[in-house]
Amino acid sequence: MLNKIKLQQKRKLIIGWSVFALINLVVILLTVLLRAGLPNLVSKGVTPFSAQAFGDAFIFLITRVYLDNFLRQPALLLGVITLIGYLALGRGGVQSVVGALKTVIGFILLSIGSGVLVSTARPVFDTIKGLGGTGVVLLDPYFSLASANDFFTNSFLNNDYVSLIAFSLLVGFIVNIIFVGLKRWTNTNSIMVTGHVMLQQAAVVTTLFYIVLFRQIPLLGTGIAYGAQAGLVIISGIFLGVYWSTASTGTYLVTNKVTNNAGFSIGHQQMLGIMTVAKLGKYFGDKNDSAEHKKLPKALKIFEDNIFTQTIIILSLFVVLFIVILASYKGDKPLLINWDKFGAINGLEIWNTTFGGANFTLNIIGGALKMVASLIAIMTGVRMFITELQQAFQGISEKVVPGAVVAVDIAAVYGFSINSVTFGFLSGVIGQFLAVAIMAGISYIPGNQFSFVAIPLFITLFFNSGAFGVYANAEGGWKAALLLPGIIGFLEIIVISFALRTVSNAYQASALLDAKQSFDLKALMGNSLDNNNGSALKTAVEKVVNATGVNRITEAQSFVKSDSFNSLKAVNSTLAQAIEWISKSASPVDNGFIGMADWNLYFGLLVWIGAYNVIGGWILVILATVGLILLAQIIDNGKQTKVTKLQQLLKINPQLDLNN
């Protein structure tokens, strides 16, 4: 029977790969033969089936068919990765295609939710910044993912680089597998399979490394140079792979303590934080005096409901932000029209559409609910395609590195220590919002250009501070669970509020913004507005065209919010598109950041210092990567049976498991 099953799997594997190869062969033949046989449809004067025709055909195949229509399309790219993974596992053609289809649809759902989230939240943040205060950044991994997608989609005229995130994820996963495969040297034994977390982290690392490491490389036209794209993917992937290998391995032993030897590690946003809490817990209390022995009030249980708590936090936050806007706005245009609807200020009029003809007060509530709904859409889309991608990744890793430990979502440990989660959550809320209050006060320092106000949302608070409660309790009892999450949360907000502003400032000195400030708008305008001599439209357009430096971006932002923008679309859509591109000057952190311990504290310190100078940034990223490799040598991974070569070289004496 077993041999029969293996034979069926081999048959499915052969059939699946044959179909995949056949499809690619048909695409290549049709593209090359049609393009070489009918070259005059594109380029006049080229002889059909000549050497030049075939050369043009192959360039078209690579750049347009595979690069632009596949490798730069993240939904299709991830779908094909799932397809290949399932085929490698012998799932058969039908199941592989269904898995790929779910992946594509899930990513499209993510994109829809991201678009709604960013378009709803951004006008509020832009208006807050326009009041003269510092910016507000929401700490939430899905806001962060949406912000990164928006940056790579809209920052480069007619170029979409979201697929770079997927490439970084793929390289990182390969590096993770290689490191675990070389565990005799690396001392790492854990493979990340939490795809949604990996995607969020790949988005943050890829976008921020572009700003920190590649911001001064001149653009190729209005796009990222090919060498910079390759370098960005490689350095991001290596950093991610080393981080995933080391940090997840470091959670294995203490997770076994929490779960009574369940045999998995954690693959989430706070793995280094978990290691830190586990080491510090014993200094704050007695692990035998556990939080699980305490009785909690029933009223606190309501905060375990994800949707309820997200709604309360987001609604409260945006009500406060709108109160600040209403109390402080002093612009020329009316903010409110007849105390009923928002005026055309920074795009705030989008909030009028939530409940149709309702008053602005109801639309504020509706807008907050709309953002919660978009977050749910993002999470649903992510779960949909990650479920498929995760199975493909896990299956591949099991075949390549048998016996490796799987790193799973942090929620897997919550059932083992429910009270500790609540202790950590409440402690984190107090500590982080105390830091928010301090950063809000700092934001009122005149001329503040050195800090943002980072505000944590539910996912950050519950899955970051709640996790710390669990691991602090395991080593230091209820006192550690009640104190450590708040202390670490406080430090997180302080560090990341300064770090994100530094990154945003670095973006303002990037080659991308230089390209926007020097883009030849006059050539695009040409004579298209000659029939509008003396008109308000031509005057408004010329203000943008003739502006220089930062003033051009400011003028472009004002222009796209005016009625003249729609008029220009009808006359010269190419010029209108270019001006709209110039107006979009948000850095990849302005609309959201991942917001959990490893990224607020450790990665936050890295980019805070590294963003000041590109060379310094490269040095720090390399040192951080090497540091993670060395950190793996002193980690007790719980399954080590022999001393590694690096441990011998560094004279480290690890704890060996002689029973394996």
Curated annotation (Swiss-Prot):
Q: How does this protein sit in the membrane? A: Multi-pass membrane protein
Kindly list the residue ranges recorded as spanning the membrane.
14-34, 74-94, 98-118, 162-182, 194-214, 224-244, 307-327, 362-382, 401-421, 422-442, 450-470, 592-612, 615-635
Q: Which GO terms describe its cellular component?
A: plasma membrane
UniProt keyword annotations, A-Z = Cell membrane, Membrane, Phosphotransferase system, Sugar transport, Transmembrane, Transmembrane helix, Transport
From which domain of life does this come?
Bacteria
Which residues make up the binding site for L-ascorbate? P141, Y142, H196, V197, M198, L199, Q200, H268, Q269, D409
Say yes or no: keyword Transmembrane helix present: yes
| Main location, first listed in the record | membrane
Biological processes per GO annotation: phosphoenolpyruvate-dependent sugar phosphotransferase system
For the keyword 4Fe-4S, the answer is no
Where found in the cell? Cell membrane
Q: What InterPro entries does the record point to?
A: Ascorbate-PTS_EIIC (IPR051562), PTS_sugar-sp_permease (IPR004703)
Q: What is known of its domains?
A: In classical PTS systems, the PTS EIIC type-2 domain forms the translocation channel and contains the specific substrate-binding site. UlaA does not exhibit the topological features of any recognized enzyme IIC.
Q: Which PANTHER family match?
A: ASCORBATE-SPECIFIC PTS SYSTEM EIIC COMPONENT
Recorded family membership: Belongs to the UlaA family.
Q: What does this protein do?
A: The phosphoenolpyruvate-dependent sugar phosphotransferase system (sugar PTS), a major carbohydrate active transport system, catalyzes the phosphorylation of incoming sugar substrates concomitantly with their translocation across the cell membrane. The enzyme II UlaABC PTS system is involved in ascorbate transport.
The subunit field of the Swiss-Prot or TrEMBL record says: Homodimer.
- Its protein name is Ascorbate-specific PTS system EIIC component
Name its species: Mycoplasma pneumoniae (strain ATCC 29342 / M129 / Subtype 1)
